[in-house]
Regions:
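Conserved phosphotransfer cores of two-component systems
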Residues: 67-72, 93
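Acidic, metal-coordinating helix/loop segments flanking the phosphotransfer/catalytic sites
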Residues: 33-48
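Conserved phosphotransfer microenvironments
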Residues: 51-66
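Conserved acidic segment of CheY-like receiver
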Residues: 2-11
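Alpha4 helix (beta4-alpha4-beta5 surface) of REC/receiver domains from two-component response regulators
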Residues: 82-97
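A short, hydrophobic beta-strand element within the central beta-sheet of small alpha/beta folds
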Residues: 73-82
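Short hydrophobic/Thr-rich beta-strand motif most characteristic of the beta2 strand and flanking loop
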Residues: 26-33
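Output/docking surface of receiver
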Residues: 94-106
């Protein structure tokens, strides 16, 4: 079982998340598409899911489909601080928390640690 499932296609952020997870003892599953993200959440039942809302893997659609299926895994999304419309769309799609990349990066270790088994 993994602790956290992440939808991200930005290699810089992927590397940052993977390294922080390693340092905090969190097991991760990294997904590049919305379909893989949903399938992994359904299979692994993680404590947390993280979404790069700028992912080309269909982030908003994946959030909507996940919530429509009844899945209540806590979801955190991150994006550029100027993308207020995207932030509102993510919240409407079922994202529990949406934050700017800077806040996500600054708090990544504590975010991941909160999902420890």
């Amino acid at each position: 079982m993994v602790d956290v499932v992440v939808l991200v296609d930005d290699l810089f952020f992927q590397a940052k998340i993977v390294e922080t997870a390693r340092l905090t003892g969190i097991t991760l599953a990294i997904c590049g598409t919305g379909d893989a993200f949903i399938a992994t959440i359904d299979r692994e039942s993680p404590k947390l899911a993280i979404v790069d809302l700028n992912s080309r893997g269909g982030a908003l659609n994946a959030l909507e489909r996940l919530r429509a299926s009844g899945n209540q895994t806590p979801l955190i999304g991150y994006l550029s601080h100027v993308q207020t419309e995207l932030a509102e769309s993510a919240k409407a799609a079922g994202c529990n928390d949406v934050m700017p990349r800077s806040k996500f990066t600054a708090n990544l270790a504590s975010i991941l640690s909160g999902a420890k088994s």
